[in-house]
Amino acid sequence: MKLSTLNETTPLVFNYANYVTPQFVANAVNVIGGSPIMAREVAEFSDLVAVSDAVVVNTGTWRRAELLETVKLIQIANQTQTVVVLDPVAVGIPSRSVPVQELLTNSKVDIIRGNAAEIAWFAGIDFASHGIDAVGSGNIEQIAQLAANKTGAIIAMSGPSDVISDGKTTRVLPVNVPLLASNVGTGDALSAIIGAFNGDEISLDNTVRAMAMMKLAGLTASHQVTTPGYFANQVLDELYLLSESKLETFIAKEVKKYE
C-alpha cells in the first residue's frame, strides 16, 4: 500500500518481538500511521491475529522452548491469510538455524528481512557473519534471488545496499546510511514497517516502499545529527514527518532494477 493508504487504514501489526527493542519497534509502527501490538501470550494468539493485518516474528532473543508457540502463531496467521514477516536474527548460528528450519517446515512465512549473512543462510550459501552485522563478499542480488526461490518468500535484505527480491524481480536501493547499523532497533523496526506496508496485499512494491521509508528517514536523520543516541530519536521523527510525495520521489530516483 502507499503511505497515504497506510495512514488512512492504520494497519494493526502484531509483533512477536525480542526483549531488546520492543519500545522502539512499537514507536516506529505508530509514527508511520500503524498500530502496534506487542504480545507473547499463547492464549491470546487467535484473538489478536484475528484483528491484525500483519504478524512479525523476531527471533533475536528466541528461546528453544518458544519454537512451538511461534509455529502456532504463524500457523494461525496462515489460516487467516495474514501476512507473516520473519526477522531471523543470527540464523546462521547452528543453535538458531535448526529451530528456524523447523519453523519453516511447519509453517509459511511471506517475507524474510535480514542482513546479507542471514539471507545467505536461506540461500544455502556460506557468508561470513559477526553478530547481527554481516561481512563478506558475494553477489548480494543473486543471494537474495536464490533465497527467495528456495523459501517462496519475498526477501528484504538490508545493509549498505538494500536488496528486495521475489525470485523473479529484484530491486536494489544502493544508499548507504552507516548510522542505521549503529542502532540495533532500526532493523527490528524495519521488519515491523514491512509488515505494516504489506497488511493489505503482499507484494514486492510494498516491501520496497517499506525499505525505502526507513532508508530515507535514516538518510535525512543523518543530515541532522551525527551520534547514535540522537540519531535513533531523529529517525522516529523523520519517519513521522515523511510525506508520500517525498517517499515516492526517493523510490523513483534511487531504487534500481537488477538485471
From Swiss-Prot:
Keywords: ATP-binding, Kinase, Magnesium, Metal-binding, Nucleotide-binding, Thiamine biosynthesis, Transferase. One of its GO terms (molecular function) is ATP binding. Pathway: Cofactor biosynthesis; thiamine diphosphate biosynthesis; 4-methyl-5-(2-phosphoethyl)-thiazole from 5-(2-hydroxyethyl)-4-methylthiazole: step 1/1. Its EC number is 2.7.1.50. Substrate binds at residues 38, 185. SUPFAM superfamilies: Ribokinase-like. GO terms for biological process: thiamine biosynthetic process; thiamine diphosphate biosynthetic process. It catalyses: 5-(2-hydroxyethyl)-4-methylthiazole + ATP = 4-methyl-5-(2-phosphooxyethyl)-thiazole + ADP + H(+). ATP binds at residues 113, 158. Its cofactor is Mg(2+). Gene3D superfamilies: 3.40.1190.20. Belongs to the Thz kinase family. Catalyzes the phosphorylation of the hydroxyl group of 4-methyl-5-beta-hydroxyethylthiazole (THZ). This is Hydroxyethylthiazole kinase. It comes from Leuconostoc citreum (strain KM20).
